[in-house]
């Protein structure tokens, strides 16, 4: 299983014949060069969304049409886009599990907000969520944008993810210290990968507090468009 950071909260996850684009933000992403867009998206089979804020979905509709791939995400938003945008969607909700290519994806809670812009102004897009992704005998937790929450207790106990992708840049999500606390208290990760940081000056620029707070855990600071073998 191979993971590639696209900057901010975006990732490319490759497993078997399946390539998931998770919250891919390309246009306007200061961390990703325009010349890297094709490599970031080529061969994708599905798009997986945690919520509808612009820095997670700005390119999603165009990508889904260009690549002819389904968008997988929260039921309310998928239903709306399926009706209004003519894209393939797979909508489900918290507690649900769907087969996405070679993976099994379970939707879990997050603690954030979830709106998107339309010609008529802001519109709510159902709940913000995270995912537990099972592939190649491993379980990977994608937190999405979130703060620490009590739900992490049962999520860690029930799904037992070995790998955590945690939004940890602060201001809009938990920061590195909070992410370390959540990981240590609620999960038994072997590997943690921070994201949603370094993008803007108001976000944290280093994962050192996460590293310091998780002795014995393999904390990987991702680099743009560089492979991480999981």
Swiss-Prot record:
Alphabetically ordered keywords of this record: Hydrolase
Molecular functions per Gene Ontology: hydrolase activity
Superkingdom of the source species: Bacteria
Gene3D superfamilies per the UniProt record, alphabetical: Ribonuclease Z/Hydroxyacylglutathione hydrolase-like (3.60.15.10)
UniProt xrefs under Pfam families: Lactamase_B_2
Family: Belongs to the UPF0173 family.
NCBIfam families: PRK00685.1
Full protein name: UPF0173 metal-dependent hydrolase TM1040_1920
Species, as recorded: Ruegeria sp. (strain TM1040)
